Amino acid sequence: MSKYVDLTGKPFHFIGIGGIGMSALAYILAKRKLPTYGSDIKSSHITRRLEAIGAHIFWHQEAKNLELFQQTTEEQNLFLSNNSSLNLSQFTPCISLGEVTTKKHNVKLENHKGISQLPQVVCSTAINTTNSEYKAAVELGCPIFHRSDLLAALIQDYQSIAVAGTHGKTTTSSLIGFMLLEAGLDPTIVIGGEVDAWGGNARLGRSPYLVAEADESDGSLVKLSAHIGVVTNIELDHPDHYDSLDQVVEIFQVFKENCQNLVGCIDCSTVREKLQPTISYSINFESDAHYKVDCVHYQSNVTLARVWEKGQILGQLKLRLLGKHNLSNALAAVAVGRLLGLEFSTITSAIALFEGAHRRFEYRGECNGIVFVDDYAHHPSEINATLAAANLQKNQELSPKPHISTKKLTLKTQNNSLKIERVVAIFQPHRYSRTQAFISEFAQSFNDADMVIVTNIYSAGESSEGQINSQQVAEAISRYHRQVYYRSSLDSVSKFLYQVLKPGDLAIFLSAGNLNQIIPELMARYQQPHYQVKSCEIA
């Protein structure tokens, strides 16, 4: 793949533009008025957001999408008139003769058929070499980039903060981005989750600052060179790419060398021993970290702590996010903010307002005394941390507003007073390779749940042949848990939950796949006037 990304005006074409990582990059390019094209197989709120700012999307992945870029303007118009999936009123051919104006440059394009007319093709690890568009890009001689190449190029344009780590990247990067936004620094933000404060997974600012989520899943983390790097933790994950923790550590060590400053959580022994960050943080007051906390109070609706900086008390920290892991994420934001010269009061004011990213302990609603929460946890450590946070809700009066992530302070419960008595975990394992590699750890990750329902593995493109299955996962969990149930399909999960959930339950959906799709339908059933708690034979 090519390494040099031209950000001066040449068109970009994203294969799989609707993905969470790809769409964030496409959004930044489109907002910078660079010609932005892409393909995907279905429309979503993410792709509609891109189209609204001028991105042009093909709803199929075919070689002819790229052939468009070698045609004359007249040929393009004919092609587009026969392609009803594109909005012709928005479409301006990117290879017409003349000048393409961008924010910083005026670039003169040569005659059609010239190599300068070919788009720069961006793909992710999910796109393989058999993809018809990818093959067409190779045959046409298009510059082809991994999405990490494009992110690396963007990072070089800014005073950048790149947040890496096995867990907590999205929350930490979005929290840092929100902090800079509240501080009036108008950052550019590129993350792997959606945040209401900027209406999606990316925003284009006007300042020199960029906050990016840095993904280690495929080894491409080594391409990123940030002014400030953050590492939240390091564990073995993505067994489809890594065979050992040592391989993961090597990637993070290269990342450290590429960053001018490294902020790291030394509660993780691997970060402490293998990376030795220049600026450290810890939620253990006995540690020798530069930033640490004491007087910690984990409550059902808030976390409180006193923050220390290099042996001196900074002051009180209050955050709406629950659990030890989120206190650690907030402390990372404190360390970054102080490194940037922000006043502690500015930092804490922002953290106190932050409501979290979507699908990170996201409150989806309450019906008939049942609270519904959506969470992205799909690794044993993430499940442990998330269920521990869920347990903080038990036996607490949630009145009048349950305090659970996004929109939590604007959604009132239907009941004047609601007490959580039971945590029900609904788990959709993600990838056969991960499930097989960590089956022993998954088996012991649900101790903080009162009931566990397991459904079929979300393959994420992996073959199921000869692989572990979810019934085996349920059996493994049942060795450590008394109430574990297996339901094969999402429909059967929904029907089962309708039978067993009751007032006082917190139903938490744990999935990086599509499990959360059943939440709206399930809530709608509970809102029907004839709803009553049913009993059934549980097996």
UniProtKB/Swiss-Prot annotation:
One of its GO terms (cellular component) is cytoplasm. Its EC number is 6.3.2.8. InterPro entries: Mur-like_cat_sf, Mur_ligase_C, Mur_ligase_C_dom_sf, Mur_ligase_cen, Mur_ligase_N, MurCDEF_pg_biosynth, UDP-N-AcMur_Ala_ligase_MurC. The keyword Cell inner membrane does not apply. Disulfide bonds: none annotated. It is an enzyme of class 6 (ligase). It is found in: Cytoplasm. GO terms for biological process: cell division; cell wall organization; peptidoglycan biosynthetic process; regulation of cell shape. It catalyses: UDP-N-acetyl-alpha-D-muramate + L-alanine + ATP = UDP-N-acetyl-alpha-D-muramoyl-L-alanine + ADP + phosphate + H(+). It comes from the Bacteria. ATP binds at residues 165-171. Pfam families: Mur_ligase (PF01225), Mur_ligase_C (PF02875), Mur_ligase_M (PF08245). The keyword Repressor does not apply. Pathway: Cell wall biogenesis; peptidoglycan biosynthesis. Gene3D superfamilies: Mur ligase, C-terminal domain, Mur-like, catalytic domain, NAD(P)-binding Rossmann-like Domain. Keywords: ATP-binding, Cell cycle, Cell division, Cell shape, Cell wall biogenesis/degradation, Cytoplasm, Ligase, Nucleotide-binding, Peptidoglycan synthesis. Cell wall formation. Belongs to the MurCDEF family. This is UDP-N-acetylmuramate--L-alanine ligase. It comes from Trichodesmium erythraeum (strain IMS101).
